[in-house]
């Protein structure tokens, strides 16, 4: 139950939530939380948070063409435009300003990235769509 609350909190507070705050929310030490999250989700907390932030950024890019990339970065929780550009390219394969029209994030590919992700793990949690 607490794990589900954490995932809901990440979805809601992605723009300012930190690793330390998430560990504290779970009442875990940071090293234990790191292992726990990776075991439960199949990827690290930071990778998961970056995927959530990337989804938000892509939504903003699609729905509000008046926003600059700096505004999109800030509103989607990235602390610098450089970090925003790096993470978006790492997850999507495209620079934010070079995304193809109608681009849609493939979550499975995003989760794989540089880490092992096995969606068949018993501990893998599917999140409901925020649509």
Labelled PLM ranges:
Residues 16, 20-52, 73-98:
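Basic/polar phosphate-binding segments, predominantly the helix-turn-helix DNA-binding elements
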Residues 62, 75, 86-131:
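…primarily DNA-binding HTH/wHTH and HhH modules…
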Residues 1-17, 23-26, 47-67:
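A short, Lys/Arg-enriched amphipathic alpha-helix from helix-turn-helix/homeodomain DNA-binding modules
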């Amino acid at each position: 139950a607490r794990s589900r609350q954490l995932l809901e909190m990440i979805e809601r507070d992605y723009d300012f939530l930190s690793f330390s705050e998430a560990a504290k929310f779970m009442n875990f030490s940071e090293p234990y939380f790191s292992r726990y999250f990776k075991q439960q989700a199949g990827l690290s907390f930071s990778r998961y948070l970056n995927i959530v932030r990337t989804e938000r950024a892509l939504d903003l890019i699609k729905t509000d063409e008046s926003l600059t990339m700096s505004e999109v970065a800030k509103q989607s929780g990235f602390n610098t435009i450089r970090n925003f550009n790096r993470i978006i390219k790492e997850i999507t394969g495209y620079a934010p300003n070079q995304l193809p029209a109608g681009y849609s994030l493939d979550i499975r590919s995003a989760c794989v990235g540089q880490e092992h992700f096995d969606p068949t793990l018993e501990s893998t949690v599917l999140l409901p769509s925020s649509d």
